[in-house]
UniProtKB/Swiss-Prot annotation:
This is Large ribosomal subunit protein eL43. Binds 1 zinc ion per subunit. GO terms for biological process: translation. PANTHER family: 60S RIBOSOMAL PROTEIN L37A, LARGE RIBOSOMAL SUBUNIT PROTEIN EL43. It comes from Halobacterium salinarum (strain ATCC 700922 / JCM 11081 / NRC-1) (Halobacterium halobium). Its cofactor is Zn(2+). Gene3D superfamilies: 2.20.25.30.
Length: 95
């Protein structure tokens, strides 16, 4: 008898929708259900409330993020750019 592997969250689709689509759904839902750090208190208690809405279970901090991740890669890039711009502006004002 062949070894059985766990199908993950996409096992509910059975043989439908193709292998690649089911794997993508499984990967997305896996990262969505992981523990995420709260940007306010730092605890690993952030959970998804709805599409793009995330809330910390410890401090109750609610914020908007990505649909499947609390912070998207493009959001990280924008935050880094803003910090860099504010850092350069702050240094030039202090001189």
């Amino acid at each position: 008898m062949a070894n059985q592997s766990s199908t993950g969250s996409a096992g509910r689709f059975g043989a439908r929708y193709g292998r690649v689509s089911r794997r993508r759904v499984s990967d997305i839902e896996g990262t969505m259900n992981e523990d995420h750090a709260c940007p306010d208190c730092g605890s690993e208690a952030v959970s998804r409330e709805g599409t793009g809405i995330w809330q910390c279970g410890k401090c109750g901090y609610k914020y908007a993020g990505g649909a499947y991740q609390p912070q998207t890669p493009s959001g990280k890039t924008v935050t880094r750019s803003i910090r860099t711009a504010l850092g350069e502006t702050g240094d030039s004002n202090s001189e």
